Amino acid sequence: AFTAQIIINHVQARDDEHIDNMDQALDRAVANGVKNLVVQPTHLMHGAEYDELMEAVEAYKDQFASVKVAEPLLGEVGSDAAVVNDDKKAVAEDLTAEAVKTAGYDSLDAAKEDGVAFVFMGHGTSHTAKVSYSQMQTQMNELGYENVFIGTVEGEPEETACEEVIKAVAEAGYTKVVLRPLMVVAGDHANNDMAGEDEDSWLSQFNASGKFDSVDTQISGLGGIKAIQDLYVAHTAAAMAEK
């Protein structure tokens, strides 16, 4: 099931393919006689859409013998920017490794020596879960990934705004930039907000700053990385194992 009706409608119109929304999927589960329900959100974090998913599940919980909801990709949020966890560590390692390989380097250090900074652009949110982006930067720092920076389209948290990230990358002395989405799917935001030709895209803003010799993009979502897929499966298994 998809949580975003606008995407469901778009796929229906474009491909004539029907995808359930949460209520439709839950209705089918009830009609099919499902007793023990396990829900695996494929969201990045505990944000607004995750809350909507939980509300939908809550309305149906009395129609199942048991309902278990697994963690989204980045796991528990935690209280402040300093809080990290094993999920964030795994995502940081897996995403960075994939970006480094795609950029043609043998290691992150080799890319650093060549003056390359990697900028991972998330969506951003006014939801309290926005601290997750700050935590991901903390995680990168703790891993010693000095040339990895976290940004967001919405600029929430404030330090993840495009102009702030440009400033941070330039001040750190990097002359080449690789932009890649910190999103499960590389859709409109990756293709347009990050890599688009409009002057307000991240690609255009990084180039317009005049601070970098090259700015490249990698348009690929987290969901295409095998290790990330495995992490979702592990979250599902953990939920199923709960007593």
What are these regions (language model features)?
Residues A1-K243:
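Active-site-proximal alpha-helix that buttresses catalytic centers in soluble enzyme cores
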